[in-house]
Amino acid sequence: MSALCPLLTPPASEALLLAQARQLSGYTLGELAAMAGITTPKDLKRDKGWIGVLLEIWLGASAGSKPEQDFAALGVELKTIPVDSLGRPLETTFVCVAPLTGNSGVTWETSHVRHKLKRVLWVPVEGDRSIPLAERRVGSPLLWSPSEEEDRQLRLDWEELMDMIVLGQVERITARHGEVLQLRPKAANARALTEAIGARGEPILTLPRGFYLKKNFTQALLARHFLLQNP
């Protein structure tokens, strides 16, 4: 049996990607970091994206911070998702930055959100803060595409939120808007402002916004998958 090691090049097929992801299941983050020659931070306060970066290394992801999917040749996006002991998501899932200007003619079919969610490799990771970061285990992966109903739910929320952005109501949007998709500020500090449209159509400066999947949406898709896998 060959020793487990990170993929040095992007996987050539979904089957190879999923096979590698399945091999990581059951390992701790500390074990995977040590095998990849990476130091595990004490916590994620200063390294919020560390788990994602670690798994990108193991799975041969190519995109880095570019707007395309993590596995561009396969059209697959990687999403790590922290879960509790019952496999329920502990936080919302970032999808992409929301465009606050230049949105004339944009449709759900051509949107960045839909592009990012077209095909996703979900990798659950233990997220209970009582477990030291190095001891948190990686779970069983799921390769997912939205069903017709999921696509409909996402589209309705996206259209409502984009209508508000275009009509100059971005600052009235709260995390409560949307059934499965929400829009909320995404900035490392409150001084990082970006241009948007105000209530009277004038240019304004506001915090950058990001689209996030709500926990009810990711919980339902994970529950369906793992119930199917473990009847």
Curated annotation (Swiss-Prot):
Keywords: Cytoplasm, DNA damage, DNA repair, Endonuclease, Hydrolase, Nuclease. The keyword DNA damage applies. It is found in: Cytoplasm. GO terms for biological process: DNA modification; mismatch repair. One of its GO terms (cellular component) is cytoplasm. It holds the Pfam family MutH. Its main location: cytoplasm. SUPFAM superfamilies: Restriction endonuclease-like. One of its GO terms (molecular function) is DNA binding. Sequence-specific endonuclease that cleaves unmethylated GATC sequences. It is involved in DNA mismatch repair. Belongs to the MutH family. This is DNA mismatch repair protein MutH. It comes from Salmonella typhimurium (strain LT2 / SGSC1412 / ATCC 700720). The gene is mutH.
